[in-house]
Amino acid sequence: MAFDLKTEDGLITYLTKHLSLDVDTSGVKRLSGGFVNVTWRIKLNAPYQGHTSIILKHAQPHMSTDEDFKIGVERSVYEYQAIKLMMANREVLGGVDGIVSVPEGLNYDLENNALIMQDVGKMKTLLDYVTAKPPLATDIARLVGTEIGGFVARLHNIGRERRDDPEFKFFSGNIVGRTTSDQLYQTIIPNAAKYGVDDPLLPTVVKDLVDDVMHSEETLVMADLWSGNILLQLEEGNPSKLQKIYILDWELCKYGPASLDLGYFLGDCYLISRFQDEQVGTTMRQAYLQSYARTSKHSINYAKVTAGIAAHIVMWTDFMQWGSEEERINFVKKGVAAFHDARGNNDNGEITSTLLKESSTA
């Protein structure tokens, strides 16, 4: 039976009648944020799988900000299986004592596109902290970069090693994850044009990026690793103490190029450094890259990572709308220049040379 999980009444009916949960109706709240899901926090009078507060994500078939940007609702099953996989392989997260974690997956209902998971509590995203005044402390930024870089390297290591295991091979079939990346890459040319950049290399760049993400089986990638999908738990009364890092939104998790996770997070760091706080963004980028290089069992393809960073810059500079129009124009031009460096394997290019220098100090 299908329920309307976009409304509070429909949600409560679903939880009480379909799942037989004892819901505290005064503790039901729709959460803001998120581009493609309706998300609720629900307080319970009696525990569900040991939890008295849960999160329910109801998948929508399009972006909340753009109904023409379609995205299959079956993506939620991949998120559910991804967070279950991470909890079953805690060494990827850094072990039981590690500070990197994911919410516990509790239930997935295919008919209603409903994913229920652990409520990890009310905390701010990394994006919230890097855009705050004053911004995140540099020491915390360094620790965040180090921890996430190590986590991603371990994810890529195990993804390569266990590619043929059924529970890993499953993610090769995340067609929505692949096509969503394709749709994002298709924004590169119009985004560049919006800032007056019409470069004949861009169609070739987009084709190469799309071909790679649609067909690569290199390793397991999180594929949506940016500051808006990372929660930080700081010690109460002691904001200089980082207790936990939660990685959210695993819907796009799939087999693909390792450079996707590197380019996405490092590209986000470049945006933060340019438009928010240079020291925080740079520190986090360096720590991430160095930690990844130390932990990864495979060498980094710097040309592909440079292209990934360039793609992130061109795709997201306009979306974030940080800085002035002139600053955004210059930054998009920097991204396009990086495409040329990646294409020509130019180790002396601004971004590529920085990556080589910083990772060599690992």
Curated annotation (Swiss-Prot):
Protein name from the UniProt record: 4-hydroxytryptamine kinase
Role description: 4-hydroxytryptamine kinase; part of the gene cluster that mediates the biosynthesis of psilocybin, a psychotropic tryptamine-derived natural product. The first step in the pathway is the decarboxylation of L-tryptophan to tryptamine by the decarboxylase psiD. 4-hydroxy-L-tryptophan is accepted as substrate by psiD as well. The cytochrome P450 monooxygenase psiH then converts tryptamine to 4-hydroxytryptamine. The kinase psiK catalyzes the 4-O-phosphorylation step by converting 4-hydroxytryptamine into norbaeocystin.
Active site per the UniProt annotation: D224
pH dependence: Optimum pH is 7.0.
EC number: 2.7.1.-, 2.7.1.222
Top-level taxonomy: Eukaryota, Fungi, Dikarya, Basidiomycota, Agaricomycotina
Subunit-structure text: Monomer.
Pfam families: APH (PF01636)
Taxonomic superkingdom: Eukaryota
Gene: psiK
Organism in which the protein naturally occurs: Psilocybe cubensis
